[in-house]
Structure formats: C-alpha cells, structure tokens
C-alpha cells in the first residue's frame, strides 16, 4: 500500500511537472528501551530542512498478529507524551518527554510512537511529501525477563514455513535466517518488514527454495542472528495446524 501511494505521488509529479518538497527530520533514539521500573525518558526530533515544520506525536500499544509479524496498533493512554504537537524551526530540535503511566508486571510492554509531519498549506505547483516515523518502545516487566524462542518447520500448500514461538516474556530480534539441507543447499527466508518477535507471539517466515523442497522427514540446520547472539540449531518438521 505504501509503495502504491509513493508511485502515485511520483506519477502525479511527472504528469503535472510539480516540484516535490520533503522536509528532512531526524529522531534520536530510534528505539526506546525502558529498564525495570523506569517510567520516564525523552526523544529528540531535529529539523534538518530549510523551513519550519510541524509534527504530531502520538503513542499506541503495539502487538503482533500471529504469523507474519505485522504491526498491530491500538489506542492507549498508558504512555503520555509532551508536547503532542510541535513546530520546529529549521536547524532546531524539539525534545519530547515520555512518561509511562503503568509499569508492566509479568510481561514486557511494547508501544510505538508515531511522529507524523503535518503538511504545510497547499501551494500551486508544489507537492509536499510528508514523513511518518515509527519508534518502538520496550518496557521491561518487574520480574526477571528473557526471550524463549522455539523453532520448527511446517509444510503447507506446497511451501515451507519456519515458525518461531516466543514463550518468553521479552521480545527478540531475529534476522539473517538461513536453513541448510542435509545435502548442503542453502534456503533463505523471504524478507520481512519487521525482525521482531514480541513476547508471547508467533512468527512465520516463508522459505524460498530454488530447487526441490526438502522432505518432511529431513532435519535442517538453522542459522540466524538475534539480540541474544548467534542462533545455530537443528529444526524439524511438525504437522501444520
């Protein structure tokens, strides 16, 4: 959908000869970890453009739909942001303060801050391209926290999925997934928009096979990288649900 919107804007610009203008905004940090018991922090938005810009800052609860890891956002009042709207002069920065109203008890709480650039008034012959940035927040629970990701393979509808179930109470980040067959063939997972698997979530990665797929009786070698370190383990097929 985002790609379609981008192509539509480009087509409009080419068709009309309009000038495309986009403000350069940066945010720091790009990920916000809140340690056990921590309730307050801040982030900084900097306008690197040549004109004033306005932004709206909102917080949402963040969960994952089991399977593809799509970001699911829900309204929340558990994160307070100040200011919620800001005007930033060129070359200037705005500090946004964040307060967590409720600390999680048993499982890591996850949120996302959406920073939306507010478009300026319309100008003849000018298309303003506005920015949206999404910043993840990870709030550790009061109890001891860890990720516990278990992997297996499923065969369904002529394709193979690598399935990961995070039974822990902390998120994990998984990337660079490769499966090696018994005859040495390398099978890579299809790219995913998000590398995260949240606490209690299930993720699926489709495995692209250039030749024949491995047999369901075969055990494959999994290698990947995670926050907790390198992953190297054998994975087996189980009956698809």
Regions found by a protein language model. Name each.
Residues 36-42, 95, 108-111, 158-160:
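Short, solvent-exposed loop/turn segments enriched in Ser/Thr/Gly
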Residues 70, 74-103, 186-213:
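Intrinsically disordered, low-complexity Pro/Gly/Ser/Thr-rich segments with frequent PxxP/GP/PP motifs
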Residues 45-49, 162-168:
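Asparagine-centered strand-capping/turn motif at beta-strand->loop junctions
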Residues 51-53, 168-173, 213-215:
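A short beta-turn/strand-edge loop motif at beta-sheet boundaries
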Residues 23-49, 85, 143-155, 194:
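Beta-sheet-dominated interaction scaffolds and their linkers
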Residues 23-26, 48-95, 177, 183-185:
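Surface-exposed binding patches on compact interaction domains or structured appendages
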Residues 8-18:
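Bacterial N-terminal signal peptides
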Residues 101-140, 144-147, 212-241:
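Terminal connector regions
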